[in-house]
């Protein structure tokens, strides 16, 4: 009697990274189970997939966690009080431009791209998760602008909410433009232009 071969196995960690890249590139709704299984390799069956990851939604959430663990520090400078507020905003935008435009991974931001298509995902949990992540980035810009006002770098009349939204809009826009193929060299110059929004609100020096 022929000996039964061993069942095919797969590297779960590598499979998670592959899933992260697929979701990053195509979003939650547009990434199919067949695409995920093919990317994972090892001839993984549907039962094996569900045994390993429970569901597509659970896998997406885990992939987001992986993404944040690898790339989620882009906005940390916004909350670092030891960094000058203007410098913190500049660092965040520069880092985002470089990461979104370069590297051996899909272009753009997985969270920003996912948030724009979250309404069609059919999952309220995923929509809320992505919106929460986006909200934290927006809150970071707001906190940075508030520090600028408190430290006397920006005029007291500065509308912190509006300026924060302007920077957050540019931050999210970098992701879209990176996916459209705008090169980092161009984006880096655009970041310099965007910082003009901060400079326009700078408190005039006294004579």
Label every PLM stretch briefly.
Residues 107-113, 158-177, 190-197:
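Hydrophobic alpha-helical segments that form the core
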Residues 62, 76-107, 160-167:
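Hydrophobic alpha-helical connector segments
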Residues 12-17, 29, 51-79, 90-97, ...:
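An amphipathic alpha-helix adjacent to DNA-recognition modules
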Residues 88-89, 102-125, 176:
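Amphipathic alpha-helical segments used for helix-helix packing
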